[in-house]
C-alpha cells in the first residue's frame, strides 16, 4: 500500500461525503482511507458505508481526545508507506495524489505539505476567510504562498509523512491547537527532509462563519505562545505581526477622539485588502467580506497571542486553550 489517507472527524458527515466523493475520483489508485470519528454526536458511519464498494475504506469510532490523538489512532491502524493527513472539510482535485507521487518520484521527501484554495462552490464568506488565511498581506505567505516570511511548515489540513518517520517522532502531541506545527517543528529538528509540494493543493472550507473563525484563530494565537514555551527558537518575526497589528489598531482607535486622521492607516490597509481580494476573487462583494475576515484573523490571533503571553510568560500558568467546551460545535 502506497498511501494511507487519515481523516479525523467531529460532527461533519456532510463534509466527509464531499471529501470521500473526491477521493473516488483520484487518478492515482494505490491508497486506503482511514476515517476516525472522535466521539461525534452526529456520526458519519452511514456516509462511510455508502463508499465501501468504491474505496478501500476503514471506519473507527473512539472516545473524544482531540484531533492530534485521533490522527494517531488512525495511523496505528493504517497500512500505507506514507500517511496523508487531511481535515474533513477538504475536497481534493482529481490529480491530488498523482501530484504527490510525481513529487516523490522526482525528489524523495520524508514529510511534505501542500497549499489550499477556495472552491468555486464555497460561499462568499468562505472565500473571504480563505483569502485572509492565504494572502501575503495577512499571513506573510507562511501557509504555502510563493512569497513568504518564514519557511514552510506542513499543516494538518494537507500533510504527508513517511510511516517510519511518523513512528520515530511519536505522532502528534496531546496539544489540541497547534499540534500540527508542533509535529512539523519536530520533523525539522529531527533532520528529516521536508518541503512544500505546490501542486498538491486542496480545496479547504475552513470555518463557515466569522464567529467560528474568530474562535479558531484566537486559539491559534494562544497555541503560538504554547509552542514558544516548548520551542523558544520557533517564534519568528512573522508570528509577532498579528499581535503588533492588534496593538496598533487599539492605539489608533483610542487616538480617534483627538485626531480623526489616526484612522487613516486602518482605512488604507482595509482598502489594500479589498482591492487585492476583489482582483483575486473577481468579486467586489468578496473583497468587502475579506476586510472583515482579515481583521478578524489578525485581531483574533493577536488577542489570543497577547492573552497567552500574559498568562504563560508573565503569570507562569500552564498550557491552555479557549472555547474548550464549544469550539467543536
What kind of region is each of these model predictions?
Residues 62-78, 99, 149, 153-157:
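Glycine-rich, basic loop-to-helix element that forms the pyrophosphate-binding segment
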Residues 1-25:
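N-proximal low-complexity "stem/linker" segments adjacent to membrane-targeting elements
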Residues 20-65:
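Acidic donor-binding segment of Leloir-type glycosyltransferases
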Residues 83:
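Short aromatic/hydrophobic "clamp" motif used to bind/position activated sugar donors
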Residues 95-127, 200-201, 205:
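Conserved donor NDP-sugar-binding/catalytic core segment of glycosyltransferases
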Residues 173-235:
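Catalytic donor/gating beta->alpha subdomain of glycosyltransferases that bind UDP-sugars
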Residues 245-315:
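Membrane-embedded multi-pass helical conduit in multi-pass membrane proteins
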Residues 42-43, 90-103, 185:
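Acidic donor-binding/catalytic loop of UDP-sugar-dependent glycosyltransferases
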Amino acid at each position: 500500500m502506497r498511501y494511507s489517507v487519515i481523516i479525523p472527524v467531529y460532527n461533519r458527515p456532510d463534509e466527509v461525503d464531499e471529501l470521500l466523493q473526491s477521493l473516488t475520483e483520484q487518478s492515482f489508485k494505490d491508497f486506503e482511507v482511514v476515517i476516525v470519528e472522535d466521539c461525534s454526536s452526529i456520526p458519519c458511519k452511514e456516509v462511510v458505508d455508502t463508499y465501501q464498494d468504491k474505496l478501500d475504506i476503514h471506519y473507527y469510532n473512539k472516545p473524544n481526545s482531540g484531533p492530534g490523538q485521533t490522527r494517531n489512532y488512525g495511523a496505528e491502524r493504517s497500512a500505507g508507506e506514507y500517511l496523508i493527513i487531511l481535515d474533513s472539510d477538504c475536497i481534493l482535485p482529481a490529480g491530488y495524489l498523482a501530484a504527490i507521487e510525481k513529487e516523490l518520484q522526482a525528489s524523495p521527501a520524508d514529510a511534505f505539505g501542500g497549499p489550499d484554495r477556495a472552491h468555486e462552490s464555497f460561499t462568499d464568506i468562505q472565500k473571504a476567510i480563505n483569502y485572509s488565511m492565504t494572502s501575503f498581506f495577512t499571513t506573510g505567505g507562511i501557509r504555502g504562498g510563493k512569497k513568504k516570511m518564514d519557511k514552510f511548515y506542513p499543516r494538518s489540513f494537507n500533510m504527508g509523512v513517511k510511516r517510519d518517520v511518523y513512528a520515530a517522532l511519536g505522532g502528534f502531541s496531546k496539544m489540541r491547537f497547534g499540534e500540527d506545527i508542533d509535529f512539523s517543528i519536530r520533523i525539522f529538528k529531527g533532520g528529516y527532509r521536508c518541503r512544500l509540494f505546490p501542486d498538491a493543493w486542496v480545496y479547504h472550507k475552513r470555518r463557515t462563519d466569522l464567529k467560528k473563525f474568530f474562535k479558531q484563530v484566537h486559539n491559534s494565537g494562544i497555541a503560538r505562545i504554547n509552542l514558544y514555551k516548548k520551542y523558544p527558537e520557533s517564534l519568528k518575526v512573522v508570528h509577532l505581526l498579528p499581535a503588533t497589528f492588534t496593538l496598533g489598531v487599539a492605539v489608533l482607535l483610542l487616538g480617534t477622539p483627538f485626531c480623526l486622521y489616526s484612522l487613516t492607516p486602518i482605512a488604507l490597509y482595509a482598502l489594500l485588502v479589498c482591492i487585492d481580494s476583489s482582483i483575486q476573487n473577481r468579486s467586489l462583494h468578496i473583497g468587502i467580506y475579506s476586510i472583515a475576515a482579515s481583521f478578524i484573523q489578525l485581531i483574533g490571533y493577536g488577542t489570543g497571542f497577547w492573552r497567552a503571553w500574559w498568562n504563560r510568560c508573565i503569570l507562569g500558568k500552564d498550557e491552555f486553550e479557549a472555547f474548550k467546551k464549544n469550539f467543536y460545535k
